[in-house]
């Protein structure tokens, strides 16, 4: 009787162990597949970013020409801004769900370069064509935000999304990571007196810096 009981207990133990190993292995496999799916989505976005970077460099050359149709150029700039904005939302969605590997950080830098180039083009276009849109540049801490900074950035992001939905083409919303050690971004931050320890920060029309905000009205008052 005792031997049978021992055998049964041993059988239960091995069954439970095998079941645990199976569930654990299945969990790892599922996590691996999900991570691969996210990474492939991010890679797809960055392949498009390569084309966009080339496109925006050509746009920059076009703006230097003596004769351009401001109406058409402004329209295309707005369309490009909308695409960059939508891609930025997708990128953040996939990046937040993935581990910040060196590969993902490197790929994120490509989009930061794209957005920075777009920002410069938007400045030039405003000067050249006397446009009435506002550049709203959101510079944030990407790699190592503290819990306090992360919470603050969540508030900033939600308010800026709400502002973009409300203002539409009246603003060029340009999110850029300020801590990715990109020389061009660092130069611009220095030019506008923005320090990394101040992040996150909202820069409006290269003049107004906002470091604390609780509602969109506090941003809108600078857009009227």
Predicted regions: what they are:
Residues 1-135, 145, 149-152, 161:
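Non-globular targeting/processing and membrane-anchoring segments
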Residues 119, 165-168, 193, 224:
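Sec-exported extracytoplasmic/periplasmic mature domains
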Residues 131-133, 154-175:
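Conserved helix-turn-beta segment immediately C-terminal to the redox Cys motif
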Residues 138-142, 168-183:
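Thiol-based oxidoreductase modules, predominantly thioredoxin-like and allied folds used
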Residues 143-147, 181, 209:
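Short acidic, S/G/P-rich loop/turn micro-motifs used as interaction or catalytic elements
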Residues 186-193, 213:
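C-terminal regions of proteins
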Residues 197-213:
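A short, hydrophobic beta-strand/beta-hairpin element that forms part of a small beta-sheet core
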Residues 214-224:
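Thiol-/selenol-based redox modules, centered on thioredoxin-like
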């Amino acid at each position: 009787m005792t031997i049978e009981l021992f055998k049964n207990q041993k059988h239960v133990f091995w069954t439970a162990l095998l079941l645990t190993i199976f569930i654990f292995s299945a969990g790892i496999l599922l996590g691996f597949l999900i991570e691969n799916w996210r990474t492939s989505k991010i890679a797809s976005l960055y392949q498009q970013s390569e084309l966009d970077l080339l496109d925006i460099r050509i746009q920059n050359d076009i703006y230097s020409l003596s004769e351009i149709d401001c109406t058409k150029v402004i329209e295309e700039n707005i369309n490009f801004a909308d695409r960059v904005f939508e891609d930025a939302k997708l990128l953040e969605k996939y990046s937040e769900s993935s581990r910040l590997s060196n590969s993902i950080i490197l790929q994120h830098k490509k989009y930061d370069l794209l957005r920075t180039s777009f920002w410069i083009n938007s400045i030039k276009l405003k000067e050249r064509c006397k446009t009435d849109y506002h550049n709203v540049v959101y510079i944030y801490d990407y790699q190592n935000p503290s819990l306090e900074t992360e919470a603050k950035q969540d508030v900033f992001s939600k308010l800026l999304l709400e502002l973009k939905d409300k203002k539409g083409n009246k603003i060029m919303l340009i999110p850029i990571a300020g801590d990715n050690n990109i020389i061009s971004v660092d130069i611009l931050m220095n030019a506008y007196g923005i320090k990394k320890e101040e992040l996150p920060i909202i820069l409006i029309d290269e003049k107004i810096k906002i470091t604390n905000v609780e509602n969109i009205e506090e941003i809108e008052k600078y857009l009227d």
